[in-house]
């Protein structure tokens, strides 16, 4: 192991000089040997500047760093603990425990920079993953081993939706999950930990946090740390869920690092390597013939603009997109998923079956027609509509309300118990509304219920 010395410190960027014959490779992990808080600080090599000098990004605060400190080259990239020892634990980007519950006690460590599985190793089966959330199962069904994006602006419910998905899937499918908190609020990370503890599924979740207050290096690499842990479970032949909250902060950390390294920015100030950085992460999230990784990624949409380069680049990698709408949230309909904007490759009669496809299509057609009629209603009122259009509006309003659902993880706020609705019940309910079977039931009865039977029961009670 070669040693070098710190020659320049500019915030999170640290230049280190090594002997000419022992220059570290790009992505090698270096360790500071010093006193106080900076002792043991890990640096990741980003560039070789020539003359034995490498430019690195600090994986922690650079407070207390000074020129002349000794640096040791580990000779390999950052490695993190993997395997069942990580379940129920909270770790940082380096795989160190931050939950004060002792050492991880892992049997194996993987480096976080790995290549994606080859074409012949990848699997191509399409099996649906039931989430128990009506609007998702109906309009944008998830595939086992697929990639899903939860798109939304600030405060429309991305994290709550993600927590409900973890809760439902962990309970219904008893699968293992890895949660990577990338640049999100520490409070949310804390809430998530206790939510999992109270639900009794903590021993099936590994948590890796690199929160908002941490340096850009941590936030850029924490998604890779979580992914590496998920890859180990997949390679053992398990079906694993990878939750990333929030993939936009991963892009943002890349932008900060890119600027710190002096690269010329591209569109809207993003890093010129945006597509490549996103591809490196997303191509590794895939299913092989041994096991599957199903990933759900929250994607913050800056200023609710889906054409922003960051969400636009993410779109290309996803199988299903769940778009959360501020207008739907303002109506008090939660989850605030837009059924007309959300898409899924699985919504195909050959995959989901003809009945499911027809019902989903019918729901979207009715809602689209209602959207077109809203302007006429606003100007002329309901009385000017034809009988057919009046019926369409009535059914569309029932569908809108029936798309809402009480969540298990939101019981604390709403006071109503959460509901898991099977796909069969979801299709039956919407099919009934479309066929006119429930035309006699007032629209209020469809709001915040689980299955259609609950809506009927609610209507009977009101009588």
Curated annotation (Swiss-Prot):
SUPFAM superfamilies registered for this protein in UniProt: C-terminal domain of alpha and beta subunits of F1 ATP synthase (SSF47917), N-terminal domain of alpha and beta subunits of F1 ATP synthase (SSF50615), P-loop containing nucleoside triphosphate hydrolases (SSF52540)
Family annotation (Gene3D superfamilies): 2.40.10.170, Bovine Mitochondrial F1-atpase, Atp Synthase Beta Chain, Chain D, domain 3, P-loop containing nucleotide triphosphate hydrolases
InterPro entries for this protein: AAA+_ATPase (IPR003593), ATP-synt_VA_C (IPR055190), ATP_synth_F1_bsu (IPR005722), ATPase_a/bsu_AS (IPR020003), ATPase_alpha/beta_chains (IPR050053), ATPase_F1/V1/A1_a/bsu_N (IPR004100), ATPase_F1/V1/A1_a/bsu_N_sf (IPR036121), ATPase_F1/V1/A1_a/bsu_nucl-bd (IPR000194)
Keyword Hydrolase listed: no
A GO molecular-function annotation: ATP binding
Location relative to the cell: Cell inner membrane
CDD domains, sorted: ATP-synt_F1_beta_C (cd18110), ATP-synt_F1_beta_N (cd18115), F1-ATPase_beta_CD (cd01133)
Alphabetical UniProt keywords: ATP synthesis, ATP-binding, Cell inner membrane, Cell membrane, CF(1), Hydrogen ion transport, Ion transport, Membrane, Nucleotide-binding, Translocase, Transport
Membrane topology classification: Peripheral membrane protein
Uppermost EC category: translocase
Known function: Produces ATP from ADP in the presence of a proton gradient across the membrane. The catalytic sites are hosted primarily by the beta subunits.
HAMAP family (alphabetical): ATP_synth_beta_bact
Protein name, as recorded: ATP synthase subunit beta
Lineage: Bacteria, Pseudomonadati, Pseudomonadota, Gammaproteobacteria, Alteromonadales
